[in-house]
């Protein structure tokens, strides 16, 4: 009987922690993600492709590449776009870095594969940068699609 009571007590003490979560943070995420309905995403996609970037370059559109790769990554794969902002993801949301971001032109958020750029884009949009777009596939996809022609679009 004592063993059963001990087990029951242990379960009662552990159950609340299993179901516990940060309710305030969940409310913030709900406010952010509830805006991303299929209709909104269809009308205003959050991604920009290599093809889109090349078209923008061709048309001489004014946009900014926000390179959020780490310093080690930017040394490993050196080319960056002319006029790009290089702000590592772990420093992006510091007030002085957010102040560098334009509000009046597209921001293509770039990382190596596009995964971190997706997270950063969602967060940037959540704080008011609705002009931020994930550079789909990142620099890896750009290099794959453009190949040797990449030197036409980048500088060392």
Predicted region positions:
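Rhodanese-like catalytic fold shared by cysteine-dependent sulfurtransferases
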Residues: 2-6, 16-59, 72-106, 115-156
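Short, surface-exposed ligand- or partner-binding patches at beta-edge/loop junctions that are enriched
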Residues: 109-111
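Structural scaffold elements adjacent to functional motifs in cytosolic proteins
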Residues: 65-67
């Amino acid at each position: 009987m004592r063993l059963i009571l001990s087990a029951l007590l242990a379960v009662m003490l552990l159950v609340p922690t299993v179901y516990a979560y940060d309710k305030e943070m969940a409310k913030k995420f709900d406010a952010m993600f509830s805006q991303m309905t299929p209709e909104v995403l269809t009308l205003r996609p959050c991604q920009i492709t290599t093809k889109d970037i090349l078209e923008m370059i061709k048309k001489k559109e004014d946009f900014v590449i926000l390179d959020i790769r780490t310093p080690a990554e930017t040394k490993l794969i050196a080319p960056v776009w002319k006029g790009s902002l290089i702000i590592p993801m772990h420093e992006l949301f510091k007030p002085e870095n957010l102040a560098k971001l334009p509000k009046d032109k597209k921001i293509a958020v770039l990382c190596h594969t596009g995964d971190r750029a997706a997270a950063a884009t969602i967060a940037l949009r959540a704080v008011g940068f609705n002009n931020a777009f994930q550079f789909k596939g990142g620099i890896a996809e750009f290099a794959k699609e453009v190949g040797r022609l990449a030197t036409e679009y980048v500088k060392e």
